[in-house]
Regions:
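N-terminal secretory signal peptides that target proteins for export/translocation
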Residues: 1-18
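Bacterial N-terminal signal peptides
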Residues: 20-30
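C-terminal functional module detector
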Residues: 34-90, 94, 101-145, 149-151, ...
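Aromatic- and acidic-residue-enriched carbohydrate-binding clefts of CAZyme catalytic domains
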Residues: 145-181
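Cap/lid and interdomain-hinge subdomains that line or gate substrate/regulatory clefts
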Residues: 165-171, 186-194, 227, 249-276
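Extracytoplasmic ligand/sensor domains, especially the bilobed periplasmic-binding protein
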Residues: 213
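Long, charge-dense tracts
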Residues: 233-234
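Conserved, charged catalytic cores of large soluble enzymes
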Residues: 238, 248-253, 335
Length: 650
């Protein structure tokens, strides 16, 4: 049986030699047996935890409240973050997330203007915490020449740190990590200790009703440099989480193997897990490809598994937006947001991007393909909601444009960071100005607890923003009337479904309708407009349309139904803007004028703010920078994307 397991591990791309796979199985079996022996103690500990939580007074909101957080955050535990100069620990990150002031990697003090409601620290599973031991000169690790060289580079300056921040992900992508990092005999004991420290820190800062510290990690699959990463988020506490070690891409780069691990975790512990893919925009066309990583066409079994384990998709983060692309959505004048520098290749630039790849990298096209799969074999692999996140590797939970803290410690606030070359390969360069100060995950839940927030994510009652706190409600139904806007929550939940929901089988004579309410970030820009993005299949053809459904001012639709620009108040000389245009709130009850009850469709809402400065403009003003690249965005329209509501005729 052990032989079959190891052969299977090899077959599915674990990249681990046979003797290591055997050792890995033995060690994991040993851990499992140890945990079984502690079942009674763990059960008592869990009971104590439940009793303790029950004594805490948690405010509940029956009609749900929006909670703001980050579902993608790295600290010094991640190898590429540590190699790039990050020394912020999970404890540092939690302290900043709850509003404390902390000196960061560059010695500058950071304090959030508004604390987070929740944080998922998602350090890379691959060598979890092991790179700290490389820095410490761990005797066993120093027997490897690559580890010794990295140890010396870690003692260098900024140039070495920038090189390591690129070299470590590349080593993972091309199976060139130091042997002790991939050898379970050396790696697992270090990872297990680091993981238990990580879960203990999460328990320390998790305060039900006040702040939620999720236990999470990132599975970092990057075959030949194509980004297929997933963030795995547990609903559970340390008692359950400590029964595992995070599943990594060193065991398998196949997401189906990750899902199998998640299923085994739930069966073993009674816990719950979900995964959030990200950066389809740099996946080399693999994120939503028509073939699995093993080369098989998608089928119903695959679709049902993916839909079960991956209810959300990260549409926005530091490495750009993955909603759509101008070459795919040619009639969408706002499709060019967050693409600068990211549509030229995959994560590592080992493979340059082609138009064919783009068809399988973005959320909107995945939604359309999902309708096609559902029609073909009765299941939709891409029935996911949308969220935003940061993917910061500094350990600093930053989101505001004028407080952008960089991707890595090497580009924390400093004059030259916008024009620095952060990656160069195959004749293509990526510059610092390609990074975006993003994003947020907003979740609707009855309370700020792990269980409530996780359940909100699972049911897709969540949305993403580019880093602004736009408050957005979306309900779909067939029985709404204008008066319902005055009681949108009661009417929305009572007569329809919220974002992430399903509507089926419209009654003859009734049109699908959506109640939408958007409120500006109180600390930022007014709202320009609300749009509904619709996709459907008609006579075998994939169709999409963007409708302007509510907007500020007295603008009128043109002959094509388009609304003119809202204007621009940004002063490029000092980085200021005013809210003399736009509106603080927009509401609408919108009926789809093209609704056909016989055609399946999806609808999601996009809310645009008025133009505002980017972090690049703030840097330009702050540091007196005279020259930036022509394609460096100085002004942008920040936005929010709701999770879709799906309509099915059956």
């Amino acid at each position: 049986m052990l032989i079959r397991f190891c052969n299977r591990l090899q077959k599915h791309g674990a990249g681990i030699p046979f003797r290591y796979a055997t050792t890995l199985f033995a060690l994991l079996l040993s851990i499992s047996c140890q945990e079984t022996a502690k079942t009674r103690d763990d059960a008592m500990e869990a009971a104590d935890s439940v009793a303790e939580t029950a004594e805490i007074e948690v405010t509940r909101y029956p009609l749900k409240k929006v909670f703001w957080g980050d579902t993608h955050h790295h600290t010094a535990i991640s190898g590429d973050a540590f190699g790039g100069g990050t020394r912020m620990t999970p404890e540092d990150s939690y302290r900043m997330a709850i509003g404390e002031a902390v000196k960061t990697n560059s010695g500058q003090e950071f304090k959030m203007r508004r604390p987070l409601d929740f944080l998922c620290i998602t350090d890379h599973a691959e060598g979890f915490g092991v790179f700290i031991e490389i820095d410490r000169g761990n005797e066993i690790l120093m027997q490897d020449s690559i580890a010794r060289r990295w140890n010396q580079m870690l003692k260098g300056g900024k140039e070495e740190a920038m090189q390591l921040a690129v070299e470590i992900p590349s080593a993972l992508a091309n199976n060139r990590l130091p042997e002790p990092v991939t050898n379970p005999e050396t790696a697992i004991p270090l990872m297990q200790a680091s993981w238990k420290d990580h879960t203990a820190t999460a328990e320390k800062y998790n305060k039900p009703g006040e702040f939620t510290a999720f236990i999470a990690w990132e599975w970092t699959s990057v075959p030949t440099g194509n980004n297929l990463h997933r963030n795995v988020i547990l609903r559970d506490d340390k008692t359950r989480a400590d029964q595992i070690i995070p599943f990594s891409a060193l065991q398998s780069e196949d997401a189906e193997k990750l899902w199998e691990f998640m299923e085994s975790y739930e069966a073993k512990t009674g816990g719950k897990a979900l995964a959030i893919p990200h950066n389809g925009n740099i996946s080399g066309g693999l994120m939503f490809a028509p073939l699995t990583i093993s080369g098989e066409p998608l089928n119903r079994e695959y679709a049902e598994a993916r839909s079960r384990w991956e209810p959300l998709f990260e549409v926005m983060q530091i490495k750009g937006a993955s909603e759509t692309h101008p070459s795919l959505s040619t009639e969408d004048e706002f499709a060019d947001f967050g693409i600068q520098g990211w549509d030229n290749g995959n994560l590592t630039l080992d493979i340059l991007q082609t138009p064919e790849q783009r068809k399988y990298q973005y959320a909107r096209q995945a939604y359309l393909n999902g309708l096609e799969y559902e029609e073909r074999f009765g299941a939709n692999p891409y029935k996911f909601g949308l969220v935003g996140a940061s993917d910061t590797h500094t350990g600093v939970p930053h989101h505001d444009e004028d407080m952008f803290w960089g991707k890595h410690a090497t580009n924390e606030p400093m004059p030259e960071r916008a024009m620095e070359v952060v990656k160069k390969l195959n004749g293509v360069s990526r510059y610092g100005y390609g990074y975006t100060s993003a994003g947020y995950t907003a979740v609707y839940a009855e309370a700020n607890t792990r269980a409530d927030l996780w359940d909100g994510m699972k049911r897709k009652e969540a949305y993403g923003t580019s880093g602004t706190r736009i408050e957005l409600r979306v309900f779909g139904g067939f029985d709404f009337v204008t008066e319902d806007l005055g009681t949108i929550l009661e009417s929305g939940y009572g007569k329809g479904v919220p974002m992430g929901g399903d509507l089926k089988d419209a009654v003859a004579g009734k049109r699908i309708a959506f109640m939408i309410h958007a409120k500006k970030d109180p600390n930022w820009a007014n709202l320009d407009r609300i749009q509904v993005v619709k996709g459907w299949l008609e006579n075998g053809k994939k169709m999409e349309k963007v409708y302007d459904v509510a907007w500020s001012g007295d603008r009128k639709p043109d002959a094509k139904g388009k609304i003119a620009s809202v204007g621009n108040t940004v002063d490029l000389t000092d980085g200021s803007f005013t809210n003399t245009i736009g509106e603080p709130e927009l509401s609408v009850l919108w009926y789809d004028p093209d609704f056909d009850p016989e055609l399946a469709a999806f609808y999601y809402v996009r809310v645009l703010e008025i133009p505002s400065p980017t972090w690049i403009l703030y840097d330009k003003v702050k540091y007196g920078i005279s020259d930036v690249a022509d394609d460096a965005p100085l002004v942008q329209q920040e936005r929010a994307w709701s999770s879709p509501i799906w309509y099915s005729p059956r």
